[in-house]
Amino acid sequence: MSRIDYRSIGLKVGLEIHQQLDTREKLFCSCPAELGEEEHDEFVRQLRPTRSELGDVDPAALFEWRKGRLYIYQAPLNHSCLVEADEEPPHPINREAVAVAVAVAKALGSAIVDEVHVMRKTVIDGSNTSGFQRTAIVALGGSIRVGSKEVPIETIVIEEDAARKVGEKGRYVVYRLDRLGIPLIEIATAPVIESPGEAREVALAIGTMLRLTGKVKRGLGTIRQDLNVSIRGGAKTEIKGVQRLELIPRVIEYEVLRQLSLLRIRDMLRERGVSREELENVEPVDVSSLLAGSKSRVIKKVLSSGGKVIAVKLPRMKGIIGMEIMPGRRFGTELADYARFWGGVGGIIHSDELPGYGITGDEVEKIYEAVGGDPGVDAFALVADKPSNALRAARAVLERVAAALEGVPEETRAALEDGTTRYLRPRPGSARMYPETDIPPLRIDENILSMAEPLVPEPPEVVAMRLKKEYGLSDQLAWEVIRDERYRLIVSLLEKYRGTLEPSYVAGFFVVVLRGLEGEGVEVWKVDDAILEKILDMVAQGEIAREAAAELVKYLANNPGSTVEEAVEKLGLRRLSREEVERIVDEIVGGLREEILKRGEKAVGLVMGRAMAKLRGRADGRLVSEIVSRKIREILDSDGKG
């Protein structure tokens, strides 16, 4: 992490935690709330923005529509119906999902609404067939304690998850409807978080509390964190889709670096006398003829297919376009993002990176001359694509540069795997939300309150104390269990194997062994709970050694469909009898007799290393250690060195 004084720059972060609920049915129909890979029907739609009741068009919706996309929907036969296809009105809201949200609200001390009113939130990126997402506030206010700080909760909302994107080609985007309508709970905090580390701790605390309800899904894609980040003098930036908890601090740090860099660029532009009026008067120039003989593969490909190369002068911006604003991303990358999304092009080429990409110094001079620029102070950007796309993209570049005069634009960005972000769309306006007229309000009655009561999660501190008392877990191991997404499974297995397997081994299998495998890149999520339980059954019954468990999980993750028994046979992990272990250790000790006599008791490490190399996964390490120690003692005693 960098040494930024986050307090001095006025960092404020708000979190929105989105978590799928583990309900039997979807939020507005009776389809199962799970993913399905069965056969599917297909249909195609094109979505268009409409005016709100106040006559306004949401800018984010307009932005998506301008892409001219067509959407192909896969409708799995057992996991979607006419509601997902938007051919039938939604059913009444799922009371089970509302009860879970009420339970969470009680745990956070939030004020639960008297009636749940469903709203429509405009979304026309294709992820909702209707062109909007249904969402409903269940509670307001409350707080969660993180360390010594009470972090205020603003809203607790339930909403339907979006369709699952499975492919994209040209104008066509393919979505699968099994995920559309799965209930989500959204918990939004006030923007009072003041450091990247604190944001991670708050997200961890909320996630832990949700898991303790026993009513949330787990696995890849079931939880997502959105961040609202701002600094003094900057702007509120919404960052969507942070999938991993450990990525939160890096995403925030990089966003702070980006905003600080954009503020520096603003000051540089003002010092150089760049004005919005000047940028508005810049006209895109067709430089296709100047580059007709270019050796650039990008340019040649576009020109040969009837496209154009459009250049725009960026007055007094030499050296600024190539400035790094966060690791691996430059101001030119920001311009390219705008060009891609508003113009539908692949990207841009700018003068701060030229000569290069097959474009020569002579060609650079000709472009400067064509746009009326001074190579000593000005910059330019090139866009190569279909004429209409290239012109739109060039104007988007100019608009983004003009926005840089104000500093940091308000926008929505997408989180990337390395912690950086890219421009996603403009910030949505107030015209985005309007009432849902097809669903009657739901009164929070005694029935819902009674459904919620047993789901109210205990404080994590109370749960940790009970785990330590009942199962003898260490404080650290107890907290690791509570924070593990398999919490409910672990607790049930701690009880199942009471008196058969040590609780520390059972808990460690999940929070140490499985996490270690995940750290190695093993896709542990592919191994379902029943198989993990079967592995522990075989350990408890003495059929396999404890050390074999990790190898089995690794094999089964890489070979979905295999049974545990097949994996044991394939890997040769059937546990050896004590007599077989004794025989193998005897062979090793016999071959090292002289070394044992020379080293004495210090030979244990050498013999154990050789023994475990032969026996790993087929015999418990404790048994091997006991036999090795005894065999060495026997040799030393027989030689009179004991």
Swiss-Prot record:
GO terms for molecular function: aminoacyl-tRNA ligase activity; ATP binding; glutaminyl-tRNA synthase (glutamine-hydrolyzing) activity. It catalyses: L-glutamyl-tRNA(Gln) + L-glutamine + ATP + H2O = L-glutaminyl-tRNA(Gln) + L-glutamate + ADP + phosphate + H(+). One of its GO terms (cellular component) is cytoplasm. Its EC number is 6.3.5.-. Transmembrane segments: none annotated. Gene3D superfamilies: 1.10.10.410, GAD-like domain, GatB domain, N-terminal subdomain. One of its GO terms (biological process) is translation. Heterodimer of GatD and GatE. Allows the formation of correctly charged Gln-tRNA(Gln) through the transamidation of misacylated Glu-tRNA(Gln) in organisms which lack glutaminyl-tRNA synthetase. The reaction takes place in the presence of glutamine and ATP through an activated gamma-phospho-Glu-tRNA(Gln). The GatDE system is specific for glutamate and does not act on aspartate. This is Glutamyl-tRNA(Gln) amidotransferase subunit E. It comes from Aeropyrum pernix (strain ATCC 700893 / DSM 11879 / JCM 9820 / NBRC 100138 / K1).
